[in-house]
Amino acid sequence: MKTLKIITASFLLACAMLSFVPVGEWIMITTNNCKIYFPKKPTDRSGTVNTAKGNLKVNIYSYQAAANVSDDNLAYILTETEYPDSVINSDDEDKLDIFFKNSIDGIVNNFHGTLLSQSKTAIDGFPGRQVKLDLQQGKAVMNIRFYLVKNRMYILEIITNTNKDGNAAIEKFMNSFEIKN
């Protein structure tokens, strides 16, 4: 019995460690539904949020670069939200524009930013939007990608100083995102 407990504990520890797999300096984060690379291990804040649309399961992974760390960006964030199918699904093409507009407006308002640009994008055939916000009256920029995969919204965000916008780490983070089918 004691051996079984040790084996079980070892297995659980190995599974936990595998969810953060380092690649070079970057660390792969995996969920049941996606994977993405962060420059360092992010903080995991997951839970359920009670909203007018019902209880939503939300996973937030974030890494904020310390002032003394040589990183071109200030913060990296992945938010994964699961909506009830009755609220939104990527197959509901007639609802997509309004859903993305409301999502973009929400981030603009939450960050007190100014929308600089937006365009349509996609991942594996699922719809998305790419957005850029001005923050702090020109001092910082937020690059955002929204993807709606069935009833899951993924939001990838990077905040950087305006003079560092367009750096290679932005594309590395954004392009490392993959969904699991």
Task: Tell me the role of every PLM-derived stretch.
Residues 23-39:
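Short N-terminal segments immediately surrounding and downstream of signal-peptide cleavage
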Residues 35-66, 100-147:
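Signature of long, low-cysteine stretches enriched in small and polar/charged residues
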Residues 48-49, 56, 87-90, 165-170:
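A short, polar/proline- and glycine-enriched secondary-structure boundary/capping micro-motif
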Residues 40-44, 97-111, 152-181:
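Surface-exposed amphipathic alpha-helical segments
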Residues 71-73, 126, 139, 148-155:
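Coil-to-beta-strand transition motifs
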